[in-house]
């Protein structure tokens, strides 16, 4: 499973929010330019977030032209990373004569390398009502969640990402609209 971390603004009035805007794509961070993940796997994650918000009494604004009418906005970001590790290697010349045979003499150690893949899904909720007059440059993040861990292939990884969305909302019972 992915490790899920959540945090929130203790002063935010989650019960006062009624509507939310959630884009139809996930920002893929990590390159020189922003790219957007829009395939059926991205849509499944987005739909899972929408279902969690809807279940808590919020109404989704689907039309991007009307997103300024939303009380909160959700931004989903995804980062996949490969880490390459190269160690100094094994020398091989320190074994006892009686156990491994005679000392083999000195030679350069061969390097040992391996790599592993990780991925992180970040969910941020911003208060869009904080900029009623249109002058605020930075909107306050009222909820933050990240799910990180090893990246697996195919549907198993997709299932873990969707499960992490559910876990993030389970860890955040304060996200609930009062209608």
Predicted regions mapped to residue ranges:
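Extracellular/periplasmic catalytic domains that process cell-envelope and extracellular macromolecules
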Residues: 13-15, 65-70, 85, 113-118, ...
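N-terminal segment of the mature soluble domain
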Residues: 25-77
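Sec/Tat-exported extracytoplasmic proteins
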Residues: 24, 49-57, 78, 129, ...
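Post-signal peptide N-terminal segment of mature Sec-exported envelope proteins
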Residues: 2-24
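Soluble periplasmic/extracytoplasmic beta-strand elements of cell-envelope proteins
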Residues: 20-23, 73-77, 122-124, 143-146
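C-terminal/domain-edge helix-coil "capping" segments
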Residues: 1-4, 9, 113-142, 147-179
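Surface-exposed short loop/turn segments
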Residues: 76-131
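Solvent-exposed loop/turn segments at secondary-structure junctions
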Residues: 27-29, 79-83, 129-130, 148-152
